């Protein structure tokens, strides 16, 4: 009897609790539909507002007279707005947009460092190591020795693509999903799927938008290189930021989906060219239709960089270089320049250090860099190699004036000093190098005129290798020029360098007194860049005052109304 009463009591309590819950639901429903119904209806009709970042226009680059090298053009990008792409539909929508891109023969951004086909392999490009490391972290903190096949399987599992029969398609979709995760795409940061698409594709995407939620078209800007061959030796290119670069940049200024200067002035002047992001508030209705878009914080475009280059002189330098190489090939013997197939030319203002022209041959067009990269990278003529700033070459007789300057500065010779040239230098019994001529007794002026080896053998011997190297450095050889972009340092002959370079010989070679003779005429281990040789000759012409070489003349605001910086001449040293 007691058990029955206890059961009845519990049943009564349960009934009361359930009744209270239903009463609560009823009250809430009444509040939503009757008391606050109009208010909530108005909110739904008004839509939802979210904030989106606005990309700034990248600063442009002009020649010294305002003629364009690198400018911007208006483009259209495909973006994936995560806020309106339910996770359950992501793979399906991405499959549809990929199919449309392939149908139109267009490419999309895919930085997944794994091949499209099985057996899956890792990519081997220059940034592969950091990209693969980042991929393994995102795929599931895989170990360093995990192979590409296992990594891909893990990624397909992660993105629910492991049961897809078409493995190549699964790889493509995974590439997009990976990039979305890697770049931090979210409701306020859309993912850029493809850049600079043609207007025909813009129209088609708008037609199919009802079937591809989250796929949108955004107006943007892209780099355009005017006369791309003329700027290839110093302008540089931009590209999507990679994992290694992202580790180095200020995260408050860059997104993983940003483009960044990769080399040349695009890289050196990145902070000047980048600009500052703005903010836009976008109001959308319940179906995702944009009701309004308001810029609440305008983007600030990057600055305009005025270079020191004279575009006309640059064009003349490139034409002249190509013409001279062809002339040498057609008229000279093979051992006297007939095999020449490449070169560089640099023109410098001796008083200011401004680089007026800097050209390489063979060259390439910046506009075609990415589309032709696979061919350019394996071209045996190395058009991508910047011979002006990074190629180092034995200078030969160009080096002789530095020995003459050193000899006079150290009191070894003066203007009237005479050296006997009898064709053979006989100071050593076991090593007697020769001159091409037999000039008799000559002074420095005549020795330079006829490029007499004997005069500089003797002057160099009396100076000693340390003084020769020191004065060469003071005149601009084997030291940084000051240029803003990447450069090789070259090297000046010294006993230490000589033995270091020959340590692997059997037996290893050691420095001897006779080596100074070859160093004195620009041979042995002397190797310098064309840019350094231009700095050196400019220093000689400027009475020993070595100027810092530079490519940036002035920095102005994007609209050219305000001068941000004017680069003044800088004296590095006086010899």
Go through each PLM region and give its residues.
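A short acidic, often aromatic-flanked loop/helix-cap motif at beta-alpha or helix-coil junctions
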Residues: 223-225, 314, 491-492
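Beta-lactam-recognizing serine transpeptidase/beta-lactamase-like catalytic domain environment
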Residues: 70, 76, 283-300, 309, ...
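Residue-level detector of secondary-structure boundary/capping sites
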Residues: 57, 88, 196, 225, ...
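Membrane-proximal periplasmic segments of bacterial cell-envelope enzymes
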Residues: 1-273, 277-298, 326-344, 350, ...
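Solvent-exposed, polar/charged alpha-helical surfaces in well-ordered, non-transmembrane soluble domains
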Residues: 91-99, 195, 199, 203-207, ...
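Compositionally biased, intrinsically disordered low-complexity segments
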Residues: 16, 21, 218, 308, ...
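A general boundary/transition motif marking the beginning of the first structured unit of a protein
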Residues: 85, 193, 222, 257, ...
């Amino acid at each position: 009897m007691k058990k029955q009463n206890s059961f009845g009591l519990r049943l009564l309590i349960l009934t009361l609790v359930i009744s209270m819950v239903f009463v609560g639901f009823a009250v809430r429903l009444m509040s939503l539909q009757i008391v606050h119904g109009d208010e909530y209806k108005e909110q739904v009709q008004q839509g939802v507002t979210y904030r989106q970042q606005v990309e700034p226009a990248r600063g442009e680059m002009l020649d010294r007279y305002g003629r364009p090298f690198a400018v911007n053009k208006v483009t259209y990008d495909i973006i994936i707005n995560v806020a309106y792409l339910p996770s359950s539909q992501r793979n399906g929508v991405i499959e549809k947009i990929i199919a449309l891109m392939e149908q139109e023969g267009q490419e999309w951004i895919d930085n997944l460092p794994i091949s499209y086909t099985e057996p899956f392999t890792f990519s081997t490009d220059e940034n592969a190591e950091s990209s693969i490391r980042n991929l393994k972290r995102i795929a599931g903190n895989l170990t360093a020795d995990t192979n590409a096949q296992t990594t891909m399987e893990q990624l397909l599992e992660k993105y629910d693509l492991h049961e897809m029969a078409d493995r190549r398609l699964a790889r493509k979709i995974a590439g997009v999903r990976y990039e979305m995760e890697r770049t931090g795409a979210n409701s306020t940061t859309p993912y850029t799927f493809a850049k600079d698409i043609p207007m025909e594709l813009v129209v088609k995407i708008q037609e199919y938008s009802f079937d591809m939620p989250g796929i949108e078209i955004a107006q943007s800007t892209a780099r355009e290189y005017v006369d791309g061959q003329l700027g290839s030796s110093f302008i540089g290119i931009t590209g999507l930021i990679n994992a290694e670069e992202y580790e180095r940049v200020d995260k408050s200024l860059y997104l993983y989906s940003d483009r960044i200067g990769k080399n040349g002035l695009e890289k050196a002047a990145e902070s000047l060219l980048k600009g500052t992001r703005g903010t836009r508030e976008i109001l959308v209705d319940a179906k995702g239709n944009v009701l309004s878009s308001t810029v609440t914080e305008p983007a600030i475009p990057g600055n305009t960089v005025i270079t020191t280059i004279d575009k006309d002189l640059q064009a003349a330098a490139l034409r002249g270089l190509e013409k001279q190489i062809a002339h040498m090939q057609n008229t000279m013997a093979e051992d006297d320049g007939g095999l020449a197939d490449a070169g560089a030319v640099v023109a410098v203002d001796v008083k200011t250090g401004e680089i007026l022209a800097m050209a390489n041959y063979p060259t390439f067009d910046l506009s075609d860099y990415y589309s032709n990269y696979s061919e350019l990278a394996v071209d045996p003529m190395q058009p991508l190699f910047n011979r002006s700033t990074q190629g180092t070459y034995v200078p030969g007789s160009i080096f002789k004036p530095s020995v003459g300057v050193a000899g006079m500065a150290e009191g070894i010779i003066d203007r009237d000093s005479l050296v006997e040239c009898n064709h053979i230098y006989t100071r050593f019994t076991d090593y007697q190098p020769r001159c091409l001529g037999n000039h008799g007794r000559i002074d420095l002026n005549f020795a330079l005129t006829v490029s007499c080896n004997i005069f500089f053998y003797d002057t160099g011997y009396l100076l000693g290798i340390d003084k020769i190297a020191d004065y060469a450095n003071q005149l601009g050889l084997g030291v940084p020029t000051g240029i803003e972009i990447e450069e090789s340092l070259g090297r000046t002959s010294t006993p230490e360098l000589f033995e270091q370079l020959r340590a692997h010989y059997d037996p290893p070679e050691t420095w001897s007194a006779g080596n100074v003779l070859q160093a004195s005429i620009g041979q042995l281990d002397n190797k310098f860049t064309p840019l350094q040789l231009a700095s050196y000759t400019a220093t000689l012409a400027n009475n020993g005052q070595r100027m810092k070489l530079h490519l940036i003349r002035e920095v102005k605001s994007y609209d050219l109304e305000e001068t941000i910086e004017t680069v003044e001449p800088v004296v590095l040293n006086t010899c």
